[in-house]
């Protein structure tokens, strides 16, 4: 699998076949941030307060919207307004994992109506290609007005100890991404997947974005099996965007923590591309 990770985001944005990837890179360049904050809080007030305070320093906010005890229209209206105010994208970490007919309803309907507000979603590919096809068809339907601003990350690897997202599963993730490049933005993985074999030929302009979870300045794990990487180690292994949660939102000063992740993440990115960012 090819990698364009040595190129600056500005170059990748200008050549990228996926419109949401272009926007993502442009946001990152404008803000000099490749940080995704995982806002795993449980009330709308906490979520919106965190988004407003950290918004200037992040490229993406990642939500688990179903853990909010008071989810409602004010949640989404507030989050959309803050995304516009601070120029960040919204990533709903739903991890879709069901048959195609079910995930279409989960994505586009129900109480959460995720397709209406989340720029980025993710899925596991245990159900095989049909899950990617179903989500792509939903987002790219002719009567859906936000299709060019919606994209999918395939959960190709996980950072938890003993994860089974390896081997053939990871190879299948690459296969399906290559079949739906206009909708699949990239991967959630622990590294660039350049060495992963695939049965599908890569397009000449292939450029999948890599998000790496479990990034923490302390580089320690937790008692539930989470294994952390530092911003430098994650980006050195091929991450384009680093996902940090507790290292930011449980810090004594979350704003100062977000600034530290922004600085370290961006410096690591600049080192990787030889300081060629604009």
UniProtKB/Swiss-Prot annotation:
GO terms for molecular function: orotidine-5'-phosphate decarboxylase activity. The active site is at 95 (proton donor). Substrate binds at residues 40, 62-64, 93-102, 228, 246. GO terms for cellular component: cytosol. It comes from the Eukaryota. Pathway: Pyrimidine metabolism; UMP biosynthesis via de novo pathway; UMP from orotate: step 2/2. Keywords: Decarboxylase, Lyase, Pyrimidine biosynthesis. It catalyses: orotidine 5'-phosphate + H(+) = UMP + CO2. It is an enzyme of class 4 (lyase). InterPro entries: Aldolase_TIM, OMPdecase, OMPdecase_AS, OMPdeCOase_dom, RibuloseP-bd_barrel. GO terms for biological process: 'de novo' pyrimidine nucleobase biosynthetic process; 'de novo' UMP biosynthetic process. Its EC number is 4.1.1.23. Belongs to the OMP decarboxylase family. This is Orotidine 5'-phosphate decarboxylase. It comes from Passalora fulva (Tomato leaf mold).
């Amino acid at each position: 699998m090819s990698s364009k990770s040595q190129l600056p985001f500005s170059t990748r944005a200008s050549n990228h076949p996926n419109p949401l990837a272009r926007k993502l890179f442009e946001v990152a360049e404008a803000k000099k941030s490749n940080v995704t904050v995982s806002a795993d809080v449980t009330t709308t007030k906490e979520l919106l307060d965190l988004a407003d305070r950290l918004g200037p320093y992040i490229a993406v906010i990642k939500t688990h919207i179903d853990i909010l005890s008071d989810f409602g229209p004010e949640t989404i209206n507030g989050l959309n307004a803050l995304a516009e105010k601070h120029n960040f994208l919204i990533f709903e970490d739903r991890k879709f994992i069901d048959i195609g007919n079910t995930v279409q309803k989960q994505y586009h309907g129900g109480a959460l109506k995720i397709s209406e507000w989340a720029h980025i979603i993710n899925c596991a590919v245990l159900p095989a290609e049909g899950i990617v096809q179903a989500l792509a068809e939903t987002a790219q339907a002719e009567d859906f007005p936000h299709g060019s601003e919606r994209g999918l990350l395939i959960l190709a690897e996980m950072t938890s100890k003993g994860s089974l997202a390896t081997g053939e599963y990871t190879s299948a993730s690459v296969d399906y991404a290559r079949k739906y490049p206009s909708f699949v933005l990239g991967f959630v993985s622990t590294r660039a997947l350049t060495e992963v074999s695939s049965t599908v030929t890569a397009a000449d302009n292939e450029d999948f974005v890599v998000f790496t979870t479990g990034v923490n300045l302390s580089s320690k794990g937790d008692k539930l099996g989470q294994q952390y990487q530092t911003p430098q180690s994650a980006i050195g292994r091929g991450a384009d965007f680093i996902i940090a949660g507790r290292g930011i939102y449980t810090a004594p000063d979350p704003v100062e923590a977000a600034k530290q992740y922004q600085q370290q993440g961006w410096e690591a990115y600049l080192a990787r591309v030889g300081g060629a960012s604009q």
